[in-house]
């Protein structure tokens, strides 16, 4: 039989974790000063007047390498539990994991062939 009180801890945690950010947002809105002057609208750089432009444009190459890192990092996180229980799961899960690994490898080979990973 389904008993609702089995989920009391979950609902309590959900309510508390929802109320705390809402309260923090409301309290900061009440306590924050409303007036905005020229000093408030200026940019801040370690207590001194900023020198040069605040806008620094990064090359797209940095984002490509960061994206490849994130893809393989997330893949590692998903593969770790599979590797820990490899002897219990069987052949079908091995095939699924192989396909899961093969897709990012094919994508990275494609990006490499297109020259997206070249640092020139």
Swiss-Prot record:
It comes from the Eukaryota. The keyword Cell membrane does not apply. Its main location: plastid. It is a multi-pass membrane protein. One of its GO terms (biological process) is photosynthesis, light reaction. GO terms for molecular function: NADH dehydrogenase (ubiquinone) activity; quinone binding. It is found in: Plastid, Chloroplast thylakoid membrane. NDH shuttles electrons from NAD(P)H:plastoquinone, via FMN and iron-sulfur (Fe-S) centers, to quinones in the photosynthetic chain and possibly in a chloroplast respiratory chain. The immediate electron acceptor for the enzyme in this species is believed to be plastoquinone. Couples the redox reaction to proton translocation, and thus conserves the redox energy in a proton gradient. Belongs to the complex I subunit 3 family. This is NAD(P)H-quinone oxidoreductase subunit 3, chloroplastic. The lineage of its organism: Eukaryota, Viridiplantae, Streptophyta, Embryophyta, Tracheophyta.
């Amino acid at each position: 039989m389904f008993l609702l009180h089995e989920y009391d801890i979950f609902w309590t945690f959900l309510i508390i974790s929802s109320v705390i950010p809402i309260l923090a947002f409301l309290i900061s809105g009440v306590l924050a000063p409303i007036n905005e002057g020229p000093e408030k609208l200026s940019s801040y750089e370690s207590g001194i007047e900023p020198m040069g432009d605040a806008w620094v444009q990064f090359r797209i190459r940095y984002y490509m390498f960061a994206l490849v890192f994130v893809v393989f990092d997330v893949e590692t996180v998903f593969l770790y539990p599979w590797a820990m229980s490899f002897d219990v799961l069987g052949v079908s899960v091995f095939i699924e994991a192989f396909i899961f690994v093969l897709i990012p490898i094919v994508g990275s080979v494609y990006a490499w062939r297109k020259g997206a990973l070249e640092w020139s």
